[in-house]
């Protein structure tokens, strides 16, 4: 059973965004990363795409969802500050979960750069995919 835990693509810096941080969008680099993630993640047999409801996470996986014809589902368990509530989501074959750095750390104890991902087999990290 293979799943992918993805940290959202580049979205600039929190302190540079004057509005509600949940609405912070991807920057130019992040938009490029999100487009490149399509080919990077296509080989993993993606059947379901889940995302934190934060704009930067949704935007990270929108190109993947569109390219694969898979519905993008927002899930609050992947939102910043939700802790390890999303652990059960990673126990589904073919799921991509897009989230934030603090959630990645809570779930697998790792630290990913923006746009990078961990590939998991039966809930255990087996590989890191560097950010495009």
Name each model-derived stretch.
Residues 2-84, 110-118, 132:
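Active-site-proximal alpha-helix that buttresses catalytic centers in soluble enzyme cores
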Residues 83-129:
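Active-site-adjacent alpha-helix immediately C-terminal to a catalytic or transition-state-stabilizing loop
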